[in-house]
Structures are given as C-alpha cells and as structure tokens.
C-alpha cells in the first residue's frame, strides 16, 4: 500500500486508503497533545480497518518552530503543502508579538479561504459541568470565518488613516453619530451575500446529512440591519431557493399565520417536522445566549457570523466541560480544504509537562475522520473517550472537579483511550 494525496472532485473528497495528511505540531503544549492524539488516531484506524487503511502523517511548519528553523512564522511552503494535500491537523499556535503581525490561525483561515469554523458541542457523561442539565447541549455551530468585524480592517486612533476614514464618513456619507471622532479608532464590518450563502448552505446540508432537526440563524439584525439583518434575510432566501421542499422556515410560518391563522401555521410546522424537514429559524444573539442556558435542547445546528460565533462557541463549551474538550475545524466545503485543530491556546506554562488534556485535539481529529468518511474509526475514539471519562481516569483539569477521579498524565490518558478502543 502506497500513500497518496486526497483529491477533490465535483462529488466531494476522494480519499485513498492511505492518505497523506499534513500536521502542524503547534507551540507550547502542542507537542504533548499531538503525541497523544496521533497515537489514538492511529490505533483507532488500525482497529476499525484491520490494517487496510492508515494515515501517513507529514509534518509542516508554523509558529515558533517554523520561526526558529526558517525565520518565518508561517512559511509559504506550509501554505502550499496544505493547499496541495487539502486536509491538515494542527495544534495551538503562538500569535507573534509585534505590530503588524497577524494571528497565524487567522492567516491560515484567510489564505485558504476556510469560511466555516465548525464547532460541535456535546456533553460526555461524567465531565464536570456548571449547569444542571449539560446532557441537553448537543449543537453544531457553523461560524462564518472570513468576514464580519474579524476581517481585520481597522484603523488606530490618532493616525492619518483613521482621520481620513472619519472625515469621509462625516463629510461624504453624512455620519453624525460618531460620538468622539477625535479619539476614536474605527473598525469595518463587511458581511456579504456570497459569504452568508455559502455558510448557510453548508449548515443546512450538514443538517440534512446528519439527521439534525433545525438550523438557527443567530444575528443582531434588530440593531445592525444592513449587515446582520441582511445575514438573516439572505439565509432565509437561500434556504427557500435551494432547499425548498426539504425545509420549513419561520418566514413560511409567519406567512401562514397572516393568511390562515396561528393554528394552521402550527399544524404546518408540525407536519413538516413529521416529514423530516429541517426547520429554519432565527434568534437575536443576546436572546440566544440566554436560551442556550435555559433551554438548549431547542437548538441544533446554528449558523452565525464571526463575532457571534466566537462568543457562542466558547459559551457552549463552558457548559459541557470547557475548551479542553471542545473540538474545532476550519473548512471550505467548496474547495475541500480543511484544517482540524484544538480550540484552546498554547498554555506555555504547561509545555513539556505531559499534564494537559489532549481531548480537544483528539476530538478535532474525530471530526477529520468523519470528514474523510472514516466513521467507524471516529466512532471508536468517541466511544473510548466516553468510557474513559466514565471510569474517572482523567487529566488534572477534570480530576480536580470530580469525586473519586484518578488523575493521569497526557500520555497515560492516551494509553487509557487506546486500551478502551473496542
């Protein structure tokens, strides 16, 4: 068996039995969690496919290791390799200190146009949680990754650039509500129809493919009408135009209320649910953040913009055990490019101590296996994590919050996971 590249066709990914997958080991605790994660992935693939499939890992450089070896934080060769091989796994990366140097994570997303930040959030039995019913949390967040206020179009207070922007807004556009123009920094919030449509399309298709019940469009369109309000409307339009008979939208519901009354609308939605149609609804962001605490079971797949998605993903992660067990992926569903990554930082004070929880990196690799269509291997890892946590053999972050837990190192936790792969 010889290793081959994953390729993309109009029908999706073409995954050989021995794909070559680049990995970025990461900074700080990156080496510790990668050693653990890669062993668990390899063991699950071996167990699931009896040696008929395996991954050939190919290291590429980014972050501190790249800078030390090449003088560049994100070498062009790394970008070209990921572009060529489509799929990659990465650990946490240090953001270089110094003006004008952007986050390496953001740079990777923008260079590869990874427009979806995918963040599934669910609870594993036994994981300590601050909420009463963490088992009600089972959501998949589709966060737009390339636009919004995170696009990085900012002008610092006091510069000639910001003065030009403010002068233009006031004198050319008639903006009179910049409260303190002499001392303001300015940020630009682009939200496009195309960017919205490709995100919402991916979210609805995911819901259909994975037997989910609804997609919630989360926005602050009541205040930001031409950006977040447009996101909501474009999302509804896309659902109606491209998924017609597979979805039932709240806008359809409102139309039926107007024409036939609320009872008829409730009946139509109930019928749609019985037929397995995806319910497309929306929620204002601040109300949504309350609902994920008070009644999280009402939401399933969530599609939202960049800033909202950042808040929502980490708020939900806190309800199920924190970002130490929160997986993430950055995906372009059109080109096939995807990077699967731990969602936490580099935690430099724990670097090399063999102490931290590798679950975020491992579960991100589960997302990768699912993305490749290797569901059997993915399920084996998920089942093993459930069994291991239920047996209270955990790393320090959980052990300190669980009665009767046995605290183990990063590598010992990986050993336990491998032992529990059935």
Curated annotation (Swiss-Prot):
InterPro entries linked to this entry: IsoCit/isopropylmalate_DH_CS, Isocitrate_DH_NADP_dimer_prok, IsoPropMal-DH-like_dom
Intrachain disulfide bonds: none
Catalyzed reactions per annotation: D-threo-isocitrate + NADP(+) = 2-oxoglutarate + CO2 + NADPH
Cofactor binding annotation: Binds 1 Mg(2+) or Mn(2+) ion per subunit.
Enzyme category, top tier: oxidoreductase
Residues the entry annotates as binding D-threo-isocitrate: 103, 105, 109, 119, 143
EC number(s) reported in the record: 1.1.1.42
UniProt cross-references to SUPFAM superfamilies, sorted A to Z: Isocitrate/Isopropylmalate dehydrogenase-like (SSF53659)
Chain residues that bind Mg(2+): 310
Subunit structure: Homodimer.
Protein function: Catalyzes the oxidative decarboxylation of isocitrate to 2-oxoglutarate and carbon dioxide with the concomitant reduction of NADP(+).
PANTHER family in the record: ISOCITRATE DEHYDROGENASE [NADP]
Family: Belongs to the isocitrate and isopropylmalate dehydrogenases family.
UniProt protein name: Isocitrate dehydrogenase [NADP]
Organism: Staphylococcus epidermidis (strain ATCC 35984 / DSM 28319 / BCRC 17069 / CCUG 31568 / BM 3577 / RP62A)
Record lineage: Bacteria, Bacillati, Bacillota, Bacilli, Bacillales
